[in-house]
């Protein structure tokens, strides 16, 4: 970026601050250290430290915990997303608690009013009459449950709000439909009341919110453990900067005076925490709601949810400032018309696009600058009955391209996540197609590394004469695939030693000859 800028303004480009959001937060911390003396911001926790803290917390969970089966990576991601959304453990607990309480209130009311989904499955009913009538009663009940409810968080409505909105829309569409169909009603039921037990149907998010309540406590303990070690994680860099600017008026005014012209690139990738940092730099009354700020972004790209980003952040930006001007960029310099046409067909399927929520509708029909600059593309869309068919077809296509003389280096397979690429790999290998696969690995999730960590923990437990930990670790370690031991024999050995509660030394001869 700086090199490109220097082509326009020369050496003055080195006087301009060009940062990532984390880099900007770090710049503030380093340049205004006197405002951060009470913060533990000298020791950034690396992946190993974070892994150890989370592993310790997870190991201390009860066996009945809903978090017990989650891997460390998913817990790390969940905490990161919460921080990026500016949601503290306390806030998260309140949100989940409110959802659970409202779900219970709804279930009680449905029971009292004898509103039961099973009536929809009775034989001989007039579905055209019964289905709408049932769901209209459900809508009335939802309205009663939600009456006078204040959201636990100002920007997070209870889940039943969205259930109510979806059902209201469904009933309205049914009234206007030329032909009655039960499919939309069944889809609604599965989407919002998809859990079935002996008492009937439950809101689909019921158990999820119970799990979130547990996670909020886990998240809180993680924060406490991190701070007790005098550490902070990557997301804390922005969060602590936000807190300090909010609390220290002098710092806020200094930053607002220094950074009077702000350009935000790829704004669709901005999360709530990053947006709040920008807001603090631009909310001075002297700006009269019109600071010198320019945001460049494409809300259609926000569907990838990069680092907690949401397209609503762009809409918030529009409403935050006075008389915000929208500059519509309709010329594309990178693609031919065929590509843009296909992209448009996909983008039009996105619900709640930015242009539909702005007071002035903007034209999102993108035009190619010059088709002659690119070769004509070959686009094909395929539907498959199974992933096996899909992966087989991709491998065959790549093999045929290579046989036709196309260099393998000119071929790429793109996917939104790593899992489908990993599943595709055996099909390419079967065709003897060499691949270059790049992935940012979490070494602690590697099976071999995880096994070595467990074995190391066992050695320490033996050294410490910790019988409980040995009893817990030994069966798991003996079950590792590379030992190739009979699972039945491992179970027998585990049962024998646990039942006798023998000494540490008795494990070794027993296990060596199992």
Regions found by a protein language model. Give the residues of each.
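Conserved helicase NTPase motor core
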Residues: 1, 17, 45-50, 101, ...
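Accessory C-terminal helicase-associated subdomains
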Residues: 209-213, 466-467, 514
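"flanking P-loop NTPase cores in genome-maintenance ATPases
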Residues: 60-210
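Gly/lys/ser-thr-rich phosphate-binding loops in alpha/beta enzymes
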Residues: 1-11, 412, 419-428, 498-505, ...
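Conserved motor-region signature of P-loop NTPase helicases/translocases
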Residues: 1-3, 91, 95, 250, ...
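Polyanion-engaging groove/track-forming segments
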Residues: 78-84, 88-91, 206, 290, ...
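A general alpha-helix detector
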Residues: 53-60, 78, 218-222, 240, ...
């Amino acid at each position: 970026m700086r090199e490109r800028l220097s082509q326009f303004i020369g050496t003055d480009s080195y006087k301009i601050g060009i940062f990532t959001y984390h880099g900007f937060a770090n710049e503030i911390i380093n340049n205004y250290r006197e405002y951060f003396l009470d913060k533990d911001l000298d020791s950034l926790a690396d992946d190993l430290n974070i892994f150890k803290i989370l592993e310790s917390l997870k190991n201390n969970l009860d066996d009945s915990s809903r978090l017990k089966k989650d891997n460390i990576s998913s817990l790390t991601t969940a905490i990161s997303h919460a921080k990026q959304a500016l949601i503290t453990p306390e806030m998260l607990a309140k949100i989940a608690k409110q959802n659970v309480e409202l779900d219970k209130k709804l279930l009680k009311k449905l029971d009292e009013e004898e509103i039961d989904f099973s009536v929809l499955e009775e034989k001989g009913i007039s579905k055209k009459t019964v289905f709408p009538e049932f769901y209209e009663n459900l809508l009335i009940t939802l309205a009663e449950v939600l009456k006078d409810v204040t959201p636990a968080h100002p920007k997070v409505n209870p889940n039943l709000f969205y259930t109510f909105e979806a059902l209201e829309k469904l009933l309205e569409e049914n009234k206007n439909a030329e032909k009655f169909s039960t499919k939309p009603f069944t889809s609604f039921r599965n989407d919002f009341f998809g859990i079935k037990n002996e008492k009937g149907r439950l809101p689909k998010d019921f158990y999820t919110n119970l799990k979130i309540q547990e996670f909020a406590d886990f998240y809180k303990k993680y924060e406490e453990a991190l701070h007790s070690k005098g550490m902070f994680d990557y997301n804390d860099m922005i969060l602590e900067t936000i807190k300090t600017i909010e609390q220290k008026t002098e710092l806020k005014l200094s930053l607002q005076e220094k950074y009077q012209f702000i350009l935000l690139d790829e704004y669709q990738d901005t999360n709530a925490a990053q947006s709040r940092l920008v807001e603090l730099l631009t909310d001075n009354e002297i700006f009269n709601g019109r600071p010198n700020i320019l945001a460049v972004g494409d809300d259609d790209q926000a569907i990838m949810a990069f680092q907690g980003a949401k397209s609503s952040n762009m809409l918030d930006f529009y409403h935050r400032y006075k008389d915000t001007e929208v500059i519509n960029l309709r010329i594309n310099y990178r693609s031919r018309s065929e590509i843009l046409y296909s992209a448009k067909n996909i983008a039009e399927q996105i619900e709640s696009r930015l242009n539909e929520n702005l007071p002035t509708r903007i034209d999102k029909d993108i035009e190619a600058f010059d088709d002659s600059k690119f070769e004509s593309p070959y686009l094909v869309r395929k539907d498959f009955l199974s992933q096996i068919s899909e992966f087989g077809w991709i491998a065959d296509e790549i093999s045929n391209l290579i046989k036709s003389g196309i260099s393998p280096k000119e071929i790429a397979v793109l996917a939104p996540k790593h899992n489908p690429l990993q599943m595709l790999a055996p099909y390419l290998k079967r065709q003897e197609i060499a691949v270059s696969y790049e992935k940012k690995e979490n070494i602690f999730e590697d099976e071999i590394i995880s096994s070595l960590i467990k074995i190391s923990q066992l050695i320490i437990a033996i050294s410490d004469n910790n019988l409980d930990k040995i009893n817990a670790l030994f069966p798991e370690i003996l079950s590792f695939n590379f030992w190739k031991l009979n699972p039945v024999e491992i179970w027998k050995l585990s049962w024998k030693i646990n039942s006798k509660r023998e000494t540490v030394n008795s494990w070794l001869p027993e296990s060596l000859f199992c």
